[in-house]
Amino acid sequence: VQIALADGDGLGDSWAQVLKCLSEFQRLHMIGTGAKTSSVFFPASSEAPSPMPQASAKGAAPSKAVASSTRHAHSVIIQPTRPRQSTAGGGSREHAVAAVDLAAVDELNSATMLDKVDVVAIDRIFSQTEVLSPEAIVHFVRNLCAVSREELASPTDPQVYALQKLVEIAYYNMSRVRFVWARIWEVIGDFFTEVGQHANLNIANYAVDSLRQLSKKFLERGELQNFVFQREFLKPFVDLMGVATSLEMKELIITCLDNLVLTSARSIRSGWRPMFEVFSIAATDPAASVAEPGFHVRLTLTLTLTLT
């Protein structure tokens, strides 16, 4: 943590190891505090997920440090006991025992983590990315996307810690010089397009809604004449609408853009183009719940922009 805070500009692709550690710290922190894991909010089944907290925006209060006056002598156990394979009849019992062993190790590690790791310092790693050099922030974002990809790969226990941090990073760095921001968003935007196609629809929906929140914040900044940053920012919506097979996903994309039109129309410039592309795709969809709102919004926008 201290190396990341002091020498972030020089870490390069070594950010991968740092961010993997932070992801593991977060997992142990949730175990130690009894918090619900991501799998509760993003079940792989068709069951409705529990209400998920909104991704943190810039200016949100950081996590509180976990204070403790007691210091333990033991250190984190890096290699936990692994389940053993067996062909004997008692195999299932051995697996159950091994699972208990792993749970005990996690409990011990989480207690050590709560006692030794400064959670506020971890938050500063992300909030201070706005002062990283142009090259360093791109390295940071690429490696955070890679860690998020690993977290989301589990079919039974996906984690969204790194994905939530990507949303925060986008907020923190949105005020950078535009050509630097364009490099950052090229990486983040492509990753949101990827996660928006996740097999777990709950995760895919979360990614699209996070994209909506970021888009609203970005559009509020306005756009100078002859620039097309809004068009690039909203491009993931077009890409996702073109490949979406889920009716729910298509409806969500339409709803997100409709919301952006209602809240940010005065600030939109080059962003109109990807919006029209999405609504045009929707207008030809065989599902009425997608085609009708897509057609009506497109028609309304055409008439409004023609008359103004």
Please provide the spans of the model-predicted regions.
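HEAT-repeat alpha-solenoid elements in large eukaryotic scaffold proteins
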Residues: 1-2, 112-123, 140-147, 155-173, ...
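Alpha-helical repeat/alpha-solenoid scaffolds of the HEAT/ARM/MIF4G superfamily
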Residues: 4-151, 166, 298-301, 305-307
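Alpha-solenoid helical repeat scaffolds
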Residues: 6-7, 172, 176, 217-224, ...
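HEAT/HEAT-like alpha-solenoid repeats
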Residues: 10-29, 140-148, 179-195, 217-241, ...
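Structured catalytic modules that directly regulate molecular switches in eukaryotic signaling
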Residues: 151-155, 197
